[in-house]
């Protein structure tokens, strides 16, 4: 039936695999291109560096830049590389709980209130700019970069700068008026560490937030957007988004608190309305919370949307299901599962082909018998 025999299975030997890796390295090192320094990646590609650090769960900008250069800009590959590096690190300390009210704020905005204590601080953002290609970047040099930095610093009014200080939470205004949903007795007090304990459903809120902080940015944005469009979530109002640095404290062997450094984070608190119930006729407001490494405001806001959606419970929509959200936004796992389809599966597929060929032959034999029987009766 098959005139051409099936091809022999391909043997991916070590020699062939090593040659393929050399070709991949050659593609990155094409002649005529200038190598990109790791310091340049850290300084000029901070958005993608922050994304890789957050999804890998490791605050190390230099290592994230190395992983990104090694992966040729593939964020999924870079996250897997950085997570692999993270597994060999020794956990020497556990930091104290960080109070983000003590954040050194670089950016702080609220869409819920026009005026907030301390004022709105736009900080570094492109939210209000047009998304047009900047052709000047094509001719950018070290000299033009230095000139632009010098001009920016010269234009600063040092006298107008306010003293450095921290800001209280905008949502504390609602809490002071008793407008936020009161805390319930079943809300956890112990933090579930997803790097040490497996997740079981229904998962505690701390585990859900940790999973979202390490989730793939595009995946949680898609699910959060589905919730905004009515598929199991809501359309919140941004109580506050803040970007800044927070101090990291640990306790040394003598029991003394030590500041070992700081990390840059983005924090978002979304305000949503609660549906009125007969048992509780007061339409309180509820908060959805998100916090992630670096400046990744989209991710933090989407975390808050999904935090609120998963607290609603039920299985009516993907954004509500804890299991669906946590499993399907885990970028490293989903990337690995999809790309594993490219690995050799010759034995299984050959078995399927043999079964199919046998079934086709049996069908042809039955058809031939029926045709012969019909011919004998005619």
What kind of feature is each model-predicted range?
Residues 2-51, 103-123, 127:
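N-terminal, Lys/Arg-enriched amphipathic/low-complexity engagement segments
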Residues 38-62, 67-90, 97:
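Hydrophobic alpha-helical segments, chiefly the membrane-spanning helices
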Residues 91, 97-160:
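Helix-turn-helix/homeodomain-like alpha-helical modules used for DNA recognition
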């Amino acid at each position: 039936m098959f005139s051409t025999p099936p091809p022999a299975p391909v043997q991916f030997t070590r020699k062939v695999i090593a040659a393929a890796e050399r070709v991949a390295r050659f593609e990155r090192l094409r002649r005529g291109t200038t190598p990109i320094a790791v310091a340049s990646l850290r300084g000029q590609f901070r958005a993608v560096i922050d994304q890789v650090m957050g999804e890998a769960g490791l605050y190390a900008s230099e290592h994230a830049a190395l992983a990104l250069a090694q992966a040729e800009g593939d964020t999924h590959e870079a996250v897997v590389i950085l997570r692999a590096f993270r597994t060999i690190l020794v956990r020497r300390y556990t930091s104290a709980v960080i109070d983000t009210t003590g954040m050194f704020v670089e950016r702080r905005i609220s869409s819920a209130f026009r005026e907030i204590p301390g004022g709105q601080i736009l900080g570094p953002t492109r939210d209000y700019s047009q998304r047009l290609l900047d052709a000047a970047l094509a001719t950018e040099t070290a000299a033009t970069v230095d000139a632009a930095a010098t001009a920016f610093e010269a234009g600063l009014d040092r006298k107008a700068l306010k003293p450095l200080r921290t800001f209280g939470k905008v949502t504390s205004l609602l809490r002071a008026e008793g407008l936020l949903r009161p805390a319930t007795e079943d809300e956890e007090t112990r933090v579930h560490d997803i790097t040490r304990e497996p997740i079981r459903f229904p998962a505690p809120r701390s585990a859900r937030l940790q999973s979202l902080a390490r989730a793939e940015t595009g995946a949680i944005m898609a699910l959060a957007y589905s919730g905004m469009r009515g598929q199991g979530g809501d359309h919140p109002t941004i109580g506050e988004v803040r970007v800044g640095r927070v101090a990291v404290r640990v306790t040394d062997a003598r029991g003394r608190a030590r500041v070992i450094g700081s990390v840059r984070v983005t924090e978002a608190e979304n305000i949503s309305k609660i549906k009125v119930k007969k048992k509780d006729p007061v339409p309180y407001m509820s908060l959805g919370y998100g916090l992630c490494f670096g400046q990744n405001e989209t991710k933090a806001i989407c975390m808050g949307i999904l935090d609120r959606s998963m607290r609603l419970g039920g299985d009516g929509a993907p954004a509500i299901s804890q299991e669906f959200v946590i499993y399907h936004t885990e970028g490293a796992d989903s990337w690995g599962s999809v790309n594993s389809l490219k690995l050799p599966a010759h034995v299984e597929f050959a078995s399927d082909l043999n079964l199919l060929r046998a079934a086709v032959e049996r069908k042809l034999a039955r058809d031939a018998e029926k045709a012969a029987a019909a011919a004998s009766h005619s």
